[in-house]
Structures are given as C-alpha cells and as structure tokens.
UniProtKB/Swiss-Prot annotation:
Regulatory subunit of the SLX1-SLX4 structure-specific endonuclease that resolves DNA secondary structures generated during DNA repair and recombination. Has endonuclease activity towards branched DNA substrates, introducing single-strand cuts in duplex DNA close to junctions with ss-DNA. Residues 35-72, 89-113, 160-193, 288-318, 348-382, 413-432, 625-771 are annotated as: Disordered. It comes from Paracoccidioides brasiliensis (strain Pb03). This is Structure-specific endonuclease subunit SLX4. Residues 160-169, 289-306, 659-668, 743-771 have a biased composition (Polar residues).
Length: 864
C-alpha cells in the first residue's frame, strides 16, 4: 500500500497491493484507488483479482497440506484503513452489496482455475481468499465448508491514513463457549483467563478415568438477596463439590460419630445419600450459595465434627456381646443409658426444652453441653447394681447352696416355680415307693389354678409320677372312666368286713375254682380303691425319713372273694374310725369351687358342671361308705397296687402257716400272682421242690419271712434296696393241688405287711442282726478255693474272673451262690440274678445276661 499526504494533513491510501502468501513477488499487484477518501469499487477488485490469479501463482504446499489431512492454521496479512465499514460481500457481476453473504467468482483456465473471494469482517477488515478446486471438482458436488476448515484466508483491515500498516500473523482458534449470559466480556483476554481457570484439558483427561457423582442438590431460590449469575453458581458449585468430597477423607481417628443421624427437613428427598453430605446440603440450602457463607458453613461443620470425635476418642463405645459367657450373664448386667439421645425419642418428647435442642442438632451446639447429660448417668453408676458377675469361686459357693429343679424344658416352662418345687420335693420322697399318697385338700386347692391353666395339655397329676399313673390314661390322654372305679363295689361291702365272723383255716371254695398257679383273672377279680383316709393323717411335712419309709405299707388284698372268704376271712385295720359326715350339697357350689374339688381328687378338669357334681358325689360316697377308713387311690395308683401286690405274691404258695409269728388276729386270704410277673420272677413250681428234705424245710422256717418283689426292671430302678430273703419252700405234707384249692391264711404282725421292693420289715430282732446279702456275696466269692485244671486248662475262680475283667453271667453266679457259695460261709438265704446285678454294678464288675434270659427265669431253680 502506498501512502499520500492530503491537503489537510491526513494520510490516505492511494493503492492497495495484494500480497498472496507463498507466492513470488511478481504476483503482488497494486490496486489504484480512484479517490483518496473511498475504497476501490468491488468490480475493480474482482477484475484485478481475476487477472492476477489467472497468472498462476505458485502454491507448492497446497497438495502437501491436503495429503496431511490435518487442519492448517492460516497466516493472513491485515490491511488497515481509517474508514469503518459494515460487513459486505462484493459480487463481481452486479456490484450489489448484501450483508452476511459470500459471493464467489469463478474464472476458468485450462490448467489453473482459481476462485477469489472478498469478505469484509467486523473490525473493518477485508478478507481476500483464493481457493483452488480439485481437478475433479466438476464431477463432485461442492460442499460448504466451515470457517475453521478453510485452506487459506486473507484478513485485511482498513484503518486511518496516519496509522501504519502492520502485517502480523494470527493463529486461529475455535472460540470457547462461554457462559450463556447477557453480558459478554469485550476483550478476548478475559475469556482466555476464564478458560485457564477452568482447566478443561485436565478435566477431560480426568473424566476419561473417573466420572464424578451426579449433583443431586435441590436448587433454592433466594428471594432476599440478589441472585448470583450463572457463572458464579457454577464456580460455587465446584467449590461445594470439593467440600463434599473432602468429607470422605480419612481423619486419622478411629470411631464413629455419636450424632451421625441427621434430622433433615420433611421435604428432603428420600434417596440414599451419605449422612455427611445431607448435613452439608441442608446447611447450604439454609445459608445460600455465596462464597463467604459457604466458607463459614464449612468452618462450622468442621468444628462441629471435631468436638464429638474428641469425646468419642476418650469414651469408646462398648463392645458387643460375642461370647457365650456374655450372653449367659446379659440378663444380670445393668443397662446403662447412652449419652447421645435418640433423635426419634427427642422428636416424640413433649418438653419444649428438648424441641429446642432438636433445632440445634445441625450445628456444633449439640455437643456443647455433654457434662449435664453425663452427670445423670454417673449418679446411676454410683448405685450398687442389683446383679453382678461374681468370681468363679464365689459362683461355685452360691451354686452349692442353690436348689436345682430338673426336668424337661416344657415342664419347667409351663409350671409355676413354687408349685413345681413343692411337687418335686414331694415326688422325691415317694420316688422309691409304688403306693400312692393323696395330697391334702389345701395343697390340692393351691395347685388347682396351675392345673387348669394348661388347657388341653396333660394334667399335672398330684399323685406320684410313675408309669402306672400314666398307664391309667387312654390313648387321648384322658383319665379312665369313673365307671371302672365303681365296678369293684360289689365285692367290698361293709357286711364283708363287719358282719361276717372269722372262718376256720382250710375252708375250700364252693363256687369258684381259682386259675392255675402264676395266673390272675382280671375279668372276675377287680380291686376297688380303698376308702380314703384323710390325707393330713397320712402325710405330714414334719415326717422324718424313717417315718416316710413306713408310709407305704398296705394290706395284701384278695383278688377272688368266694364263699370261703366271705364266711371266714376278714380284714381289720388298726386305724381309728371316722364319724360319717353329712353329704355336702355340691349343686350349691360355684363352678370354680367344683373345679378345685375335682382337682383335689386328682382328676382332669371337666368342663361340664353336671359331670363335676356327679363325680364329686361318687367320690364322697366312696370315701364315707365304710366305717373303716383306708386310703383312696386314683385309677393309675390302683393299677400300681394291683401290679405290686401281685408281684409280691410269690410268698403265697410257699409260706407255711407257722412260719410267721402269730401276734395278730387279722387273717388275709391268698392272692394269686400275675402271670407276667411269674415269668419275670421265675416262681418255682412246687412239684419240683417236693424232693427237698424236711431238715432243710425245718431250717428255713426259723428265719423271718418277707415278701420278695424282684425283677429286672425293679432291680434297675432301686439300687439302694436291701436284699430280700428267699421265698419259703412248702412242706411235704401239702400237695400242690391242695394248695391251689385251699387258700392259705397266716397271721400278720401288729404292723401291716410290707409290699415294698427289696425291703425286709423290721418286725423281728433276727432280721436286724443278719448281715446284708451284698457283704455275704463278697465273702462267698473270696472264700471260693482254687479249682483244679480240667484237661490241662486252668479253671479260674469267680474272684479271678472279676480281677481279669471277664464278663460275669448273672444267672451262673446266682446259681453258684445259692448252691455252693453261701454254704461255705453259712448263709441260708438265696439271691436272684437281679440282686446279683445290683451287687456287680455297685462293685464295678462287668456283668451280662444270658442270651436266653427271656426264656429262662431270673431266679433259677437251685438244688438243695
């Protein structure tokens, strides 16, 4: 461009020289201006450019740029001019100016065709751009390219004449997208500073590795203060995000904050978010989004979280119960209330003071006064605890003095502690006995509520807990019908005991033939429960153990009442007579009283009132029917007495009339033993014993008599019983057939005859001086001499077998003791395998039964 000085002293451009980059100097042509105050016309510019470009300026780098396939930054000369013009695109055909449009003029040449373009951009710059199309441009469609993808651009700026024209290269960059705000910065430097502050390059690379969490904050419109711009919101949002993420950093203190629960507003979202973030968001919503307020909130939150951490570091939380001992002793420990209040309990409280504390939970004032809350707990700690875990030695001492209750969990859980203890205590006294001792009315009445509370379950019987009590029930668990008790009334009339005189011994039966030996007819013989004596007369709480042993002595009852027994046999009991009481009117009782009365008799609760009245009337009649008062039995205990009375009747066929001291006038007829008990006890057949000598019989009659009840089951349950004596053998003068037809009678001593298992009645002085059979068995085994070898094989003695832990056959040892062992030591009594088993178990001797013990008897026959 050439400059000329005008008359008024201003400089103007007289010509414009176009400079094409990467071209030879000859390519630059000058455009003469018609007037110093006007720019060249578009037509002249187009004509000049078309002629200059048709000459083919050298562009060696065009093909290279195209082959590289990358965006090339163009450097353009800037032409300055003093006149400011609007953006114009000058067309070469009509010379019309249209704003915002581009016009291209195409000049065709055989080998080198170019396109020239003039574009006036804001800032009074003229852009002269030349493009060369490809060789196959005619065949391909021309596509419009964006500004950033143009090959070459020439920027020209028209400035005043006094300014110098400067050619400066400029690197084009894509303008960054700023904030969508109404006010944009006027200079590009401010935008560059904003871009540098955002650090988009680092953010892009960081985004490839990690995607930040989605911002779920609730926008809050602050109507009080001026709303900040969107740029300020974005900057403050970035700072708040960094603050939130900083809460996840490890603080170096192990422990959880006491107030980790945050009480958010009811309108807060229900999404799962970290508790710390919820707390910070609530503070941000309240205080706003300004930088100064956000910094103060951060300081408050840090100070609030630092205080409870120090408190929790000093007082760590208690460890959970993780051991068996901790679980066992948990119910004895004193529960201490925690220092931190539960937010739910605080919100539900009606006190206004507590509601004020709830509003201050989000700030540090919550932990400002923990001392007042701690004082309440320290006062409780000073009080002595109700239960405390004692050392093991003291625990063992306390365990020794503790009364233990044994039973299944259902029994211990359903029963009351006091009643259960009384029942267990009463049951332990009569556990070794088979007879039933009814409880008093007071005790039965006290236990009635616990019995009725079980509902449909089994009734907790007030009688002894034995198998015969359970056998008195049907398959549904109900007590046997009462009619079975009344079936036996026909043979136990008052006239039998009162009006009939004593009959001479040896009277034969007229109408009924007894069954064979060892059998009992249950169809024709049924026992009626004896009339009950008042329970307080039988059982008292102050009885000594020696007295309790004599409580279960009952009279052997006959199983068949025939003409002989009705005419000649009678039973007299030494207990005093009771006056007959008036029959109470049970219909006037209430239902609860009737239930107590029924429970007092040991029956299951009955729902019907009429059935209870009928049952009580029958029970009262049975008690007061006879003048002789004898104990009343329940159906289960009645079966027990039948069984045990028949078990002990091995005495009957083998006793001689003169073998028992005649100190009483009471006579009892013979009772047939049970068939099943005969098998288990092995009652010897009299015909086999008929070969015994009179000398042995005379010697046996001098020893005191006792009833023996020993079988396999009885020996298992009673380990502390005294060995009984051997049943007596009959004399030669009496044949077995005569004994079957003639009921033997014998005189009883003043005390009732004992039917207890393995016990000898203390009626004579001779039985007290006799040593126990256990010591006699030991003496007999040790007194056995050595045996001679048989066929070169040594025969060990019983003592040597025991020392070598050889299994001892109980039947063989019992036979040896009865034949050879007791004769060496002068013992006249005999033992059964059941008693030998008890001795073996007490001495720790290995003993076994024979394989055929179900066929053979427990008490085998012993030859004299």
């Amino acid at each position: 461009m050439t400059r000329q000085l005008s008359s008024d002293g201003r400089m103007f451009a007289s010509s414009i020289i176009t400079v094409i980059p990467d071209s030879s100097p000859t390519a630059a042509e000058a455009i003469e201006l018609s007037s110093p105050l006007s720019l060249p016309s578009p037509t002249s510019l187009l004509d000049f450019l078309s002629t200059s470009t048709s000459r083919g300026p050298a562009r060696s780098d065009t093909d290279g740029d195209k082959t590289q396939g990358k965006e090339v930054l163009d450097t353009r000369p800037i032409l300055e001019n003093s006149f400011r013009r609007e953006n114009r695109v000058v067309s070469g055909t009509g010379g019309k100016a249209a704003t915002g449009k581009k016009l291209k003029r195409r000049t065709e040449s055989p080998g080198n065709a170019c396109q020239s373009e003039i574009h006036i951009v804001p800032g009074e710059r003229i852009i002269l751009r030349q493009t060369r199309p490809d060789k196959k441009a005619a065949k391909t469609k021309r596509t419009k390219k964006e500004d950033g993808l143009m090959n070459r651009k020439l920027y020209g700026r028209v400035s005043k004449a006094n300014q110098t024209v400067s050619l400066q290269p400029e690197t084009k960059k894509s303008a960054p997208k700023g904030c969508n705000d109404t006010t944009q910065p006027a200079e590009n430097g401010h935008i560059n500073d904003l871009d540098d502050g955002l650090q988009l390059e680092q953010a892009i690379q960081r985004r490839l590795d990690w995607t930040p969490t989605k911002d779920t904050t609730i926008p809050v419109i602050d109507l009080v203060g001026d709303s900040p711009s969107s740029c300020e919101k974005s900057l403050s949002g970035m700072r708040s995000t960094r603050t939130m993420l900083s809460n996840y950093e490890f603080s170096g203190i192990v422990g959880t904050l006491g107030g980790s629960r945050s009480e958010g507003t009811p309108d807060a979202p229900t999404t799962k978010r970290p508790v710390e973030l919820l707390k910070v968001n609530n503070l941000k919503e309240i205080s706003g989004l300004s930088d100064s307020r956000q910094s103060s909130i951060t300081e408050d939150s840090e100070s609030a979280t630092s205080k409870p951490r120090r408190v929790k570091a000093k007082n760590p939380p208690k460890s959970k119960l993780t051991t068996i001992t901790s679980y066992a002793t948990a119910k004895y420990t004193v529960v201490e209330k925690s220092v931190d209040l539960d937010p739910v309990e605080t919100l539900l409280s009606d006190e206004p003071g507590k509601e004020k504390n709830v509003a201050k939970r989000t700030s540090g004032a919550r932990y400002a006064k923990p001392g007042r809350k701690k004082s309440a707990t320290t006062e409780k700690k000073n009080e002595p605890p109700i239960f405390k875990v004692v050392p093991p030695l003291e625990a063992f001492k306390a365990f020794d003095g503790q009364e233990l209750l044994f039973g299944t969990s259902s029994q211990l859980a359903n029963g009351h502690s006091e009643d259960q203890h009384e029942q267990n205590e009463g049951t332990s006294h009569i556990s070794n006995s088979s007879a039933f001792i009814p409880l008093s009315r007071s005790e039965s009445s006290s236990k009635a509520p616990s019995q009725t509370s079980l509902g449909s379950g089994f009734l907790k019987l007030s009688s002894s807990k034995n198998l015969w009590s359970a056998g008195a029930r049907d398959l549904t668990g109900a007590v046997l019908e009462i009619d079975e008790i009344d079936l036996s009334e026909h043979w136990m009339k008052p006239s039998i005991f009162e009006s009939q005189p004593k009959a001479p011994l040896g009277c034969k039966a007229d109408t009924q033939i007894p069954p064979q030996l060892g059998e009992i007819d249950f169809d024709n013989s049924c026992q009626k429960p004896l009339a009950a004596i008042d329970p307080p007369e039988l059982v008292t709480q102050s009885e000594t153990p020696s007295e309790k042993g004599d409580l279960h002595k009952y009279i052997v009852k006959p199983t068949h009442i025939n003409s002989c027994s009705q005419s000649g046999s009678s039973i007299s009991v030494g207990s005093p007579e009771k006056p007959v009481q008036d029959k109470p009117i049970f219909s006037g009782f209430t239902t609860s009283e009737l239930a107590k009365k029924v429970a007092a008799y040991g029956f299951k609760p009955i729902k019907s009132r009429d059935k209870m009245i009928a049952l009580l009337e029958k029970c009262w009649e049975n008690r007061n029917k006879t003048s002789n008062s004898v104990p009343k039995l329940t159906p289960g205990d009645r079966l027990s007495q039948v069984d045990e009375s028949t078990q002990g009747q091995s005495l009957g066929p083998h006793l001689k009339p003169n073998s028992i001291p005649q100190t009483a006038t009471t006579q009892v007829p013979k009772v047939k033993p049970d068939k099943r008990d005969t098998k288990s006890q092995g009652v010897p057949v009299p015909s086999r014993r008929s070969t015994s000598t009179s000398k042995v019989s005379r010697k046996r009659t001098e020893s005191p008599s006792a009833i023996l009840v020993d079988d396999d089951q009885r020996s298992d349950s009673t380990g502390d019983s005294v060995p009984p004596s051997r049943p007596r053998r009959p004399s030669k003068s009496c044949t077995p057939r005569d004994r079957q037809k003639t009921p033997e009678s014998f005189n009883l001593p003043t005390t009732p005859l004992t039917i207890r298992s393995g016990k000898i009645p203390s009626t004579g002085t001779a039985s007290e001086t006799l040593p126990s059979l256990s010591t006699q068995i030991t003496a007999a085994i040790k007194a056995q001499p050595r045996l001679r070898a048989f066929n070169g094989v040594k025969q060990p003695t019983w003592y040597e077998k025991i020392l070598m832990y050889d299994p001892i056959q109980l039947e063989d040892l019992a036979v040896w003791l009865n034949t050879d062992g007791f004769e060496r030591i002068g013992e006249d009594r005999e033992v059964c395998p059941g008693l030998v088993r008890e001795w073996c178990e007490s001495k720790g001797v290995c003993c076994i039964w024979r394989k055929q013990r179900g066929v053979r008897a427990h008490c085998p026959l012993v030859r004299a």
